[in-house]
């Protein structure tokens, strides 16, 4: 009996040592992570924050997003699997004072595994009194293809909508970590963070954009990575990519891309 007690005491002490050692290792790992975050520059933090979504690019089949989960926080209701919002828009000025803006928004609901949205066509005027002309054409995604739900008599526009591809479907940011010497802007009060890079026309993403869109300027674009909200992640804020080819008046040319994961709206999912 005395022998059994000694064995039990030995095992208790051993487990206690392992537990304390484990806690020590966990604390060491936490300290290492905290130290890494402290030593990372804001530029590195911005790139790491974007990498959480950009590492998924190219998303050739958008329906794969039904099986992917983004950043979750207390804004999500119990049982809500979340919704991905994806947007690609292209704006170009062909004459001073007017900006032609077209693109698509799609909401991919992971609860229902349904994706609906719209294609938008808009003219943005310097004279804001004229800015009431946006047209929206309802669409849905089926078998990774855009299906037009509204009647569109313009055959050219109809074809453009049905063949539309989001930037995230062909963009590749595998070398994002190699982007260097960005122009960094931060506002901790908002909070917001921005990294801007001068790209080269030989960049594969830039070349692809020139193939798809009527980009007439030969200027190499600036790439802007913009975060609104907590740099570590937030379902309230958002992240946006922007390629600006020209800022000249009457020649403004911009591609913007947005992929965000957030709570599903208007549903009882509990």
From Swiss-Prot:
Task: Give the species this sequence originates from.
Answer: Staphylococcus aureus (strain NCTC 8325 / PS 47)
Q: Where is this chain's protein located in or outside the cell?
A: Cell membrane
Show the coiled coil region(s). none
The yes or no answer to whether the keyword Phosphoprotein is present is no
What is one term from the GO cellular component aspect held by the record? Answer: plasma membrane
Q: Would the keyword Lipoprotein be found if you checked this record's keyword annotation? A: yes
Q: Which domain of life is it from?
A: Bacteria
Lineage, top ranks: Bacteria, Bacillati, Bacillota, Bacilli, Bacillales
Q: Which residues are the lipid attachment points (N-palmitoyl cysteine)?
A: 23
Query: Know the name of this protein?
Result: Uncharacterized lipoprotein SAOUHSC_00405
């Amino acid at each position: 009996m005395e022998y059994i007690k000694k064995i039990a005491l030995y095992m208790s002490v051993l487990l206690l040592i392992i537990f304390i050692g484990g806690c020590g290792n966990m604390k060491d790992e936490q300290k290492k992570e905290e130290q890494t975050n402290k030593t990372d520059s804001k530029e590195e933090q911005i790139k790491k924050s974007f990498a959480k979504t950009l590492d998924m690019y190219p998303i050739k089949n958008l329906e794969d997003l039904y099986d992917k989960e983004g950043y979750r926080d207390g804004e999500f209701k119990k049982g809500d699997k979340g919704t991905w919002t994806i947007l690609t828009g292209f704006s170009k000025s062909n004459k001073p004072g007017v900006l032609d803006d077209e693109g698509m928004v799609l909401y991919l609901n992971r609860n229902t595994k349904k994706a609906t949205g719209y294609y938008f066509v808009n003219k943005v005027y310097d004279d804001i009194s004229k800015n009431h002309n946006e047209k929206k054409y309802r669409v849905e995604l089926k078998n990774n293809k855009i299906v037009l739900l509204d009647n569109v008599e313009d055959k050219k526009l109809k074809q453009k909508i049905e063949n539309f591809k989001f930037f995230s479907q062909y963009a590749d940011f595998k070398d994002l970590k190699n982007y260097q010497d960005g122009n960094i802007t931060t506002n901790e009060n908002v909070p917001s963070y921005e990294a801007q890079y001068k790209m080269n026309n030989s960049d594969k993403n830039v070349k692809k954009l020139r193939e798809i869109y009527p980009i007439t300027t030969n200027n190499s674009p600036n790439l802007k990575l913009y975060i609104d909200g907590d740099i570590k992640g937030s379902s309230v804020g958002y992240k946006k990519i922007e390629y600006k080819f020209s800022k000249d008046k009457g020649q403004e040319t911009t591609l913007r891309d947005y992929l965000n994961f957030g709570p599903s709206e208007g549903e009882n999912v509990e």
